[in-house]
Amino acid sequence: MDTLATSINQFALELSKKLAESAQGKNIFFSSWSISTSLAMVYLGTKGTTAAQMGQVLQFNRDQGVKSSPESEKKRKMEFNSSNSEEIHSDFHTLISEILKPNDDYLLKTANAIYGEKTYPFHNKYLEDMKTYFGAEPQSVNFVEASDQIRKEINSWVERQTEGKIQNLLPDDSVDSTTRMILVNALYFKGIWEHQFLVQNTTEKPFRINETTSKPVQMMFMKKKLQIFHIEKPQAVGLQLYYKSRDLSLLILLPEDINGLVQLEKDITYEKLNEWTSADMMELYEVQLHLPKFKLEDSYDLKSTLSSMGMSDAFSQSKADFSGMSSARNLFLSNVFHKAFVEINEQGTEAAAGTGSEIESRIRVPSIEFNANHPFLFFIRHNKTNSILFYGRLCSP
């Protein structure tokens, strides 16, 4: 399971860099864990080159801890095998069960599903494996004759699964009579901070988008003993904010320079992020924390992005090999749709009522001001499995 979590985190950073190429200066927010999980559902039914490409993009067949080289990449593409695939899906089952374990302190709900044209029936074995590993049931629908009705039904299902927060996942004209198979995924999260911000401490402050432009934002404030980590190159400071129960945490990477986000994104790798955010790097400080309230909602049509990352065959009618999913010829993945929503406020992530008392440590620690008044990166992490659930870039609240 640790290896799978590493693969998901590596995929998160690769995907973030690819999305950043077409979103310079814009906010980014997505659930890497949700996207990886839903793509693994498709991967379960792939064979041959299609499977090898997906395994490469999703980092499933990368030797953990081994540095990449052209030779190792070529070898890795050729070493895909079915036993490796079975282990991956078994690990997904374990990871999903752990992350979605019922919890009184936060709520995580997924909406991952595969919809296939009914004239391309799924193998019984594939349906059984989907239920075993992912607790999911692929749906056979009538895209040919009722594509828009199916689109509306899918949107309604996603909305119900995400407490009404993810609406209209599939936009108008995104599904038509030529659609053969689509993948939809969304993740809804509601959590309460371990230490909540006091509403009366929230005031209007400037957020510096760059050296010449700023905008007024509602800036939250608290003074607490919190965990800080320092990054020497590129120069940045990080902070960990726990959610109640400490199963999840918000990690913020704040460049020291107002324009330092581009360099931070360029330099970040899974290995570096893992090192920066390790327990050994965390130090307890008396922190004067300034954090903007913000709400992000991003939608992604991931077909072109995933194709450019290397899994083009899955989207090709002539090249896709989904023989592990269906015996019908010419079955291919028409599109992958993803939508994510986050709201950071005084209570936590997404509004939630709650009160709590706490006992402050009397140990003297150094003090520091952490002023998130310019662009930064943030992650929501499941700590027990070390899995990045959400990746975000805030350029303008």
From Swiss-Prot:
Report the PANTHER family cross-referenced here: SERINE PROTEASE INHIBITOR, SERPIN, SERPIN B10
Q: Where is this motif: Nuclear localization signal?
A: 74-77
Q: Does the keyword ATP-binding apply?
A: no
Query: Taxonomy-wise, where does this protein's organism fall, top ranks first?
Result: Eukaryota, Metazoa, Chordata, Craniata, Vertebrata
Biological role? Protease inhibitor that may play a role in the regulation of protease activities during hematopoiesis and apoptosis induced by TNF. May regulate protease activities in the cytoplasm and in the nucleus.
Question: Which is a Gene Ontology cellular component entry for this protein?
Answer: nucleoplasm
Organism of derivation: Papio anubis
Give one Pfam family, short name only. Answer: Serpin
Molecular-function GO terms, alphabetical: serine-type endopeptidase inhibitor activity
Residues annotated as site: Reactive bond: 362-363
Lineage: superkingdom:
Eukaryota
Instruction: Give the protein's recorded name.
Output: Serpin B10
| Localisation | Nucleus; Cytoplasm
